[in-house]
């Protein structure tokens, strides 16, 4: 394991705490984030995707913000694609909001839904704009989702036009399983 070999010095110093599980069999983004935040011991928790890294001064900046303000959460600028999953908030707010919704499986949307619930609970969304905090390791999109259930098990996808606002979706999985549903654009449909 790379982490045990490369980061043992920091693990032994207590700077890095490392947890690993072999369950579930496929990567589940919402579940992994919930587990990390539940295992965290600090008052302020931050999610940072594995392909991201922060610049010097980020922790100090966040601690100052959370010491001086109440009922807030920080995200990166949501216009930048590769840093979308970042969020910092007080651990108690995470627990009270019940974490990420684990119904969301696959890539994306779990962040948006979680941020929306925080806003509905009266928290204020702040955005850190310092360019030194926007560091990412560049890689192909395929690497981003390589361990996800859909990529490992999906065999075919069929789309059936219903009307300008609705499309029926049939997903065939390996092992003779399938999923079916309708994608509907409610906003466009109501105009």
Name these PLM-found stretches.
Residues 45:
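Short aromatic/hydrophobic "clamp" motif used to bind/position activated sugar donors
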Residues 49-53:
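The conserved acidic donor/metal-binding loop of glycosyltransferases
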Residues 95-116, 127:
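Donor nucleotide-sugar recognition loop
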Residues 59-85:
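Conserved donor NDP-sugar-binding/catalytic core segment of glycosyltransferases
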Residues 23-40:
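Glycine-rich, basic loop-to-helix element that forms the pyrophosphate-binding segment
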Residues 112-191:
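C-terminal catalytic/acceptor-binding lobe
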Residues 41-42, 85-98:
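Conserved nucleotide-sugar donor-binding
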Residues 1-24:
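Acidic donor-binding segment of Leloir-type glycosyltransferases
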